[in-house]
């Protein structure tokens, strides 16, 4: 009886610890996102020298790196900027594509950093790209599998375990994304410094914006890991 009470207290303590962890990560995520939004709103109002738009920045960076087979296109929405290795396109959101600002330059250079990675066969990018089909499947089904798994854990624990494996795949993807995004920002910062498209003040602002963006990926990866551990704890706790 004492062992049972002790076990229940141990499980309750673990739950409390993870709830504190969740709240901490959620708060950190909110602060990072708020900081990033404020910086990009601020830097979107600061023009760069030469009147170069986001598209101009992207084309120049690609050409400076000897890349001529990547197209720069405009895509609808906000914060929809991305590089598509499948069709070799740098997709810039409308508020970046035609805008001459420090924020637009930073975003465009970052996305072109991915194109440079692709051209140089950067290993983490290749690994991330190879995982996309698996992650797409996992993302579509993992929450349903986990939900069913929690209701049937005492009868069919294999369902919950399968859900945890799917979630673990997305967590792994989050951590593989970190070096890819950080390296793309590093390439962007290096090019912005060498290309002469920003002055000293604007360059510092661009670096600050890119650094803040990188923090969002770190927080997202830690949040995914914390959630994974939470599901693992439920699985192991119920098995006890």
Put a short name on every predicted segment.
Residues 1-2, 62:
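Structural motif
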Residues 3-11:
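Short, small-residue-biased leader/transition segments that mark boundaries at the very start
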Residues 14-39, 149, 156, 161-164, ...:
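Hydrophobic alpha-helical transmembrane segments of small proteolipidic membrane proteins, enriched
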Residues 22, 142, 156, 163, ...:
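Hydrophobic alpha-helical transmembrane segments of integral membrane proteins
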Residues 132-156, 191:
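Post-HExxH zinc-binding segment in Zn-dependent metallohydrolases
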Residues 151-161, 170, 195, 225:
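Loop-helix junctions at membrane interfaces
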